[in-house]
């Protein structure tokens, strides 16, 4: 009984000591406590993380006023608020890659529609025609297999350059020494030696890539909304319609009969 009482007193004393330590603003680890249950140490780490991310963003091309109408970093979803530098590096690598693919896609989209009858083009003797969104299904066997191999080789090369071994802390992370987007592919020697010129060129690439991503999405949606009408057909129709409508307004003001009928958009889906 005496032993039990002694143990209870020790427990009470221990709890009292803990309360006094916590009341003094310290935990056993020595970190100061703040309101909300966080410690000063964790708050300082969070502040350092935010500062590191903001400082890193300031070094990236395409994140300043030189890249567009937005002042500083355009981040409407506040993704950078909870990100690390590693996250930002991975996002930038993704943006560069998707921008480059989109630039090729936007060019190929309109070229494929305009060169469908060109003998040297991959049109399989005229079997590939019409809207670009329909041409995917018209491609015959013998094309996709080499393309898949080429894409696999290109991606393997890109991964070997920039991505860390996907084990432990290296999973889904880029190599620290990797220069984002630099695949050492410059057959024409266009890469400038001057850092300012290089940054300007990188910003232009980013802006063109961003525009291309929006453009290719718009191309697809436009052709889905207007079946059978190719992109250039829609463009030329819009220009022609605007011109005819302006002429019609002028003729009405002058009391003249209309000279041209308002064009209608053809539907080639049938």
Curated annotation (Swiss-Prot):
The keyword Membrane applies. InterPro entries: Chloro_AB-bd_pln, Chloroa_b-bind. Chlorophyll a 3 binds at residues 138, 205. Chlorophyll a 1 binds at residues 74, 95, 210. Photoregulated by reversible phosphorylation of its threonine residues. It is found in: Plastid, Chloroplast thylakoid membrane. The keyword Nucleotidyltransferase does not apply. It comes from the Eukaryota. Binds at least 14 chlorophylls (8 Chl-a and 6 Chl-b) and carotenoids such as lutein and neoxanthin. Chlorophyll b 1 binds at residue 56. One of its GO terms (cellular component) is chloroplast thylakoid membrane. Chlorophyll a 2 binds at residue 98. It is a single-pass membrane protein. Pfam families: Chloroa_b-bind. Chlorophyll a 4 binds at residue 208. Chlorophyll a 5 binds at residues 204, 222. Gene3D superfamilies: Chlorophyll a/b binding protein domain. Residues 1-47 form a transit peptide. Its main location: plastid. GO terms for biological process: photosynthesis, light harvesting. The N-terminus of the protein extends into the stroma where it is involved with adhesion of granal membranes and post-translational modifications; both are believed to mediate the distribution of excitation energy between photosystems I and II. The LHC complex consists of chlorophyll a-b binding proteins. The light-harvesting complex (LHC) functions as a light receptor, it captures and delivers excitation energy to photosystems with which it is closely associated. This is Chlorophyll a-b binding protein LI818, chloroplastic. It comes from Chlamydomonas moewusii. The gene is LI818.
